[in-house]
Amino acid sequence: MIIKLLVALIHYLHETMAVQSIITTPLLVILMSLRSYAFTEPSLHRQQPPSKGGVRAAYWPAWSDFSTSSIDTNYFTHIYYAFVQPAPESFNLEITESYKKWAPKYDGIHNIRPRVTTLLSIGGGGNNATLFSEMASSKQNRASFINSTIHVARKHEFNGLDLDWEWPGDEKDMSNLALLLKEWYKALVVEANTSRKSRLLLTSAVYFNSTISLIGNGPRSYPVRAIRKYLDWASPMCFDYNGAWANETGFNAALYDPNSNISTKYGIGSWIGSGVPAEKLVMGLPLYGRAWELKDPNDHGVGAKAVGPAVDTDGSMDYDEILVFNKDTGAKVVYDEVAVSFYSYSGTTWIGYDDGPSITKKVQFARSMGLKGYFFWAIGKDKDWTISKQASNAWGY
């Protein structure tokens, strides 16, 4: 009865848009966790036929040594070039020496068959969030940025533009994001009419949840109306749920988590519940895992104490690297049926990741929810296309 009352309360607060002003963050997290139980469990057996416009996408990191000419486009419909950045002060896209070096490698993608749709992605995880905030803060700044993106996209024959702003810092940023999307879309329509070319696509990578509440400056919600009206689709990044920033092991991209609201099911449900149609969502999937150094090698379950990352500075490991580690060390591999995720451990190293069976179920989940598609971060981490092929097959191709 108490849970029902709390669920009813948060539904009321959400509808009145008062949730962020009268509930403290800890209580908000508790209520959101309880609310996750109210979402209807999708049937993974009631598959929808893939839509004609279904998206099977992946990001190509420009710094990767993986050539675009080696991409098997049988498994993808869309490829993102990641990333370019706006310049300080002018907010025009910076065509740096690095970009000039990497762009020719990407240009070869136009010669691959079957053809794919290409998008230029702006921002990324290492972007200067303050710079994006400044860019979006005035009409003049937004216009400079928008005009520059269109110019660069047309010059290099991209089919669309993608915004990866990580992250809008407060509600003012979210309001300005709405204005940016509106003005950007209208500029794309005008340019298409003037050039007599197809309108450039406009998409955006977004937080896994429609409200950012666990990082940054307190809860702030994405501008759902603008996203629904002006984007071709939004791409929730359904990964990085756990990492070496917390000294205990956890899944990188749990589909379900009965104990919290940090899961793909909850995140996608929040986007749909906020008013973004399922057919405008492209769900993110990781081709990498997160590795910890265990505090005690005999304590190796989910939630085990750790002392930091096992590799690199952030503990990230490409899927191919994980397979090599598992084979070379004879690691114990465990599939968690509740989270729909894998983990492996050997000695003091513990890795949470996805493999073919979990990716297949996640793609089936996306289909059962009526989503527009899925995307991977990132090409080059699955060199023999093992997971990419299984995902494509699960989508129905």
Curated annotation (Swiss-Prot):
Top EC group: hydrolase
Catalysed transformations (reactions): Random endo-hydrolysis of N-acetyl-beta-D-glucosaminide (1->4)-beta-linkages in chitin and chitodextrins
SUPFAM superfamilies for the chain: (Trans)glycosidases (SSF51445), Chitinase insertion domain (SSF54556)
Keyword Transferase recorded: no
Induction: Induced by the fungal pathogen Fusarium oxysporum.
Family annotation (InterPro entries): Chitinase_II/V-like_cat, Chitinase_insertion_sf, Glyco_hydro18_cat, Glyco_hydro_18_chit_AS, Glycoside_hydrolase_SF, Glycosyl_Hydrlase_18
Active site per database record: E166
Pathway in which the depicted protein is active: Glycan degradation; chitin degradation
Keywords assigned: Carbohydrate metabolism, Chitin degradation, Glycoprotein, Glycosidase, Hydrolase, Nodulation, Plant defense, Polysaccharide degradation, Signal
Family to which the UniProt record says this protein belongs: Belongs to the glycosyl hydrolase 18 family. Chitinase class V subfamily.
Role, per record: Possesses chitinase activity in vitro toward glycol chitin, carboxymethyl-chitin, colloidal chitin, and the chitin oligosaccharides (N-acetylglucosamine) (GlcNAc)6 and (GlcNAc)5. Hydrolyzes (GlcNAc)6 into (GlcNAc)4 and (GlcNAc)2, or two (GlcNAc)3 molecules. Has the capacity to inhibit hyphal growth of the fungus Trichoderma viride in an agar-plate bioassay. Involved in symbiotic signaling. Required for root hair infection threads (ITs) elongation and nodule development. Possesses Nod factor (NF) hydrolase activity.
UniProt protein name: Class V chitinase CHIT5
Lineage, highest ranks first: Eukaryota, Viridiplantae, Streptophyta, Embryophyta, Tracheophyta
